[in-house]
Each structure stands twice: as structure tokens, then as C-alpha cells.
Design a protein with these regions (language model features):
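Mature-chain termini and adjacent capping regions
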Residues: 1-402
């Protein structure tokens, strides 16, 4: 049997005894200097409390209207959750508490978690909070917004429903960077629904998810026009841990440039939210304009728009094929770099070029042209027999085109 401090009701009785006017007008709400409502657990330890510097109590309706209410939920006798709002309505002796106006629910700990909303219903006996207007849950570096949220306190579970959006919280990002070339905005991943355990950090969204990234430097769209994303990501779900700063995207995973100039098809891919990186240590395929690519491992830097293949890089376009241990290319500029055991093969004259490093760039026709500035290369050709391939003028050697 729980114990409830009846300070609210006792204060109402004292006020009635001390004021004859109040007795004649019992239907009118009464003003109190303060509200102090407390509940204990079966062992006598504090379970929760609600305080307010000013409240009005309606005896007949058993309602208390409080200004600037402040609540605390205890665990093992110690404060665990803090609750704050601009206004509150207490029903009975605390069966339900309606909170309104910038509601903040703070989970205490080494890395506090905050859940905010415009309104919330606190049901202490069910250990449940329902945030049904613009709920937002955020920790130090990540943020989830949705249409509705239910926080089951004892189960350490927040159910976010109504197209929840997971993103890197920009206010927590490092301010370092080049102001002349602003980085793209953080990737936002929209799910059908999300379950999150804020204390442990576990997060799951088992249905299809879609991520979008927008270029910060693009001009603002017209008033009725929605901005177009520069990068689109899809996966069959996600699972991860926000306290550890990662989410695993469930295969198959697709990353697409909105301009149609590049794509990646991958298996399970990890999204390091805090570092804004996508990575996978499983084989993938892709294409960049006319250039096909595949490799055994990749990383996408979402801030720099760089794609890095750190093992088993292969690039191919009609008549040419390049292999290397590592490759790096930048999507917006179309610049490439291949390093470590680079081998470029061309069908023309069966040319084979070996180098430690080759650079390249996507041309206007969508093909890549590579060069080796300041690097030594070794090329081998197989020339056709004399009399084949034309005669007469001596042709200049062809550039290393890829």
C-alpha cells in the first residue's frame, strides 16, 4: 500500500475553517501559497513529489492548478528524474497530472537525457508519461523528434510514434571548420516508429527507414517549394545504441546522390552519429557517373562528402580497369585518388601501368582521367605488328585516361 502525503487536502481544510467567506462560497477555487504533494513507496522511501510556489484548489472538482510545477521521481530514495513545466493540473491526490508549456523531463546521470514537449500527462501510479505535442528526446549529441511519445519509466522505454526523425544534434557539434565551405547539414533518418531505452541507450526501428542530407550552401527554395536533398539513404531498419554513438542500418542499404551521379549498394552499414560517418566492412558495389566501383570496405564522411575504400578497391569503365589497395573520391568535385599497389589496365595496346599513387577527375563526359604528378610509373604496352594500326605520322602518346 502506497502512502500519500495529504498536505494538499489538509491545507484546504485549514483554509475553510479560518475564513467564513470561503465557507459561503465553497464552489470557488482557493489560492494557496504553495503546493507540496508527495508519495512514498511500500518501504517508506520517497517515490515521487510535486511542488509549486503557487496553486489554486477546487474542492468540489478535486483539482489543483499549479504554476511553475516541479516534480521529482525517486529511485532507491535518490532523485532519478526531474520534471518541469509552466503550468500543471493535479487530479485528486495525484492520480494524474497534466503539464503544459515547455515541459522538460530530465533523466539524471553522467550523461543526462532530456525529453521535451508542449504538453504531457504524468500518471504516477502507472509510472507513465505521455507527451502528445511535439515531443523531442535528446542526449548530448543526438536527437529524436516525433508526433507522440510515451515514456514507461520502470521499463526504461520511450516509444516514439508518428514519423520519428533521428539526427545528429547540431548544437552539440564542434564549431571547427572552414567557414568559406560550409559542411552539409547533418543526416536525418526518418523511421515509421522508434523504440528507445534512454538509460541504456538501445534504439530499434525494425521497419524501412529513409535518410536525407541537404547542402548548406544551396540557395533557399521558393516559399511553397520543399528543399531537395543532396543525398538519400534507405535501409530495412536500424538498431544501435545512442549512448555509444552508433546505429547499424539493416541490409540492404542504398546511398544515392540526388543528382543521379553516384550510388552505393551495401550490406549492413554503421552510422557513427557523433562523427557523421557511414561505414561497412563488407563488400559493396557502386557507380560514379560512368565509373563502376566495388570494394571490400568503405567509409563515407558525410561532412566532407568523401568516399573512402580502405581495402580491395576496383574501378572500371569501358576499356579500362584500375585496382588498388585504397581509393578516395569526393562526390561534389569528382576528384579521385588511388594509392598502394595501383594497377591500371587498358584494352588499347594491352597497356598496364603500375604506380604507388594515381590521381584523377571525372570529366564532362562522365569518364575519369587519371594522372600521376610527381610520381614514378611503370607502363607496359603490346604494340601491333608492323603494318597494322596505320602508318606515316608518329602519334603523340595517349594520356593515362580512365
Amino acid at each position: 500500500m502506497v502512502r500519500i502525503n495529504r498536505a494538499l487536502q489538509l491545507s484546504a481544510v485549514c483554509l475553510l475553517v479560518g475564513c467564513s467567506t470561503a465557507t459561503r462560497q465553497g464552489s470557488q477555487p482557493f489560492s494557496f501559497r504553495a503546493l507540496d504533494l508527495r508519495q512514498q513507496d511500500p518501504k517508506g522511501a520517497p517515490a515521487w513529489e510535486l511542488k509549486s510556489p503557487e496553486a489554486r484548489y477546487d474542492i468540489q472538482r478535486k483539482l489543483a492548478q499549479a504554476l511553475r510545477p516541479r516534480g521529482t521521481v525517486f529511485r532507491r530514495g535518490e532523485p532519478s528524474i526531474l520534471i518541469a513545466a509552466e503550468r500543471g493540473t493535479v487530479i485528486g491526490d495525484g492520480q494524474a497530472i497534466q503539464l503544459e508549456g515547455t515541459v522538460r523531463i530530465t533523466l539524471l546521470g553522467e550523461e543526462p537525457v532530456e525529453i521535451t514537449g508542449d504538453t504531457a500527462r504524468w500518471l504516477p501510479r502507472q509510472e507513465l508519461m505521455v507527451i502528445d505535442q511535439r515531443p523531442v528526446a535528446l542526449d548530448r549529441r543526438s536527437r529524436i523528434s516525433a508526433e507522440t511519445a510515451q515514456y514507461f519509466i520502470k521499463r526504461d522505454l520511450v516509444e516514439l510514434r508518428g514519423a520519428p526523425v533521428l539526427e545528429h544534434w547540431q548544437d552539440g557539434r564542434s564549431k571547427a571548420g572552414n567557414a568559406k565551405t560550409p559542411a552539409p547539414l547533418p543526416l536525418k533518418v526518418k523511421a515509421q516508429w522508434v523504440d528507445w531505452k534512454p538509460e541504456r541507450g538501445d534504439l530499434t526501428a525494425p521497419a524501412v527507414v529513409r535518410g536525407e542530407q541537404f547542402e548548406q550552401s544551396k540557395p533557399a527554395p521558393a516559399k511553397d517549394e520543399k528543399p531537395a536533398p543532396s543525398l538519400v539513404l534507405t535501409a530495412q531498419g536500424l538498431r544501435g545504441n545512442l549512448r555509444q554513438g552508433y546505429v547499424d542500418l539493416v541490409a540492404p542499404v542504398q546511398v544515392r546522390r540526388a543528382d543521379g551521379k553516384g550510388w552505393l549498394d551495401a550490406k549492413q552499414t554503421r552510422w557513427a552519429i557523433n562523427d557523421q560517418l557511414l561505414s561497412s566492412d563488407q563488400p559493396f558495389t557502386g557507380q560514379f557517373n560512368a565509373l563502376k566501383a566495388k570494394g571490400d570496405r568503405f567509409t563515407v564522411d558525410l561532412e566532407k562528402s568523401d568516399v573512402k575504400v580502405s581495402r580491395g578497391c576496383e574501378l572500371e569503365q569501358p576499356g579500362e580497369r584500375l585496382t588498388a589497395m585504397r581509393c578516395l573520391w569526393n562526390w561534389p568535385s569528382g576528384r579521385f585518388e588511388a594509392t598502394d599497389q595501383v594497377v591500371l589496365k587498358r584494352e588499347t595496346y594491352k597497356q598496364v601501368t603500375r604506380a604507388k599513387r594515381l590521381e584523377g577527375k571525372i570529366g564532362d563526359d562522365g569518364t575519369a582521367v587519371f594522372s600521376s604528378p610527381g610520381e614514378r610509373v611503370n607502363s607496359r604496352f603490346t604494340l601491333p605488328p608492323k603494318g597494322q594500326g596505320g602508318g606515316g605520322k608518329k602519334r603523340a602518346p595517349a594520356p593515362i585516361a580512365f
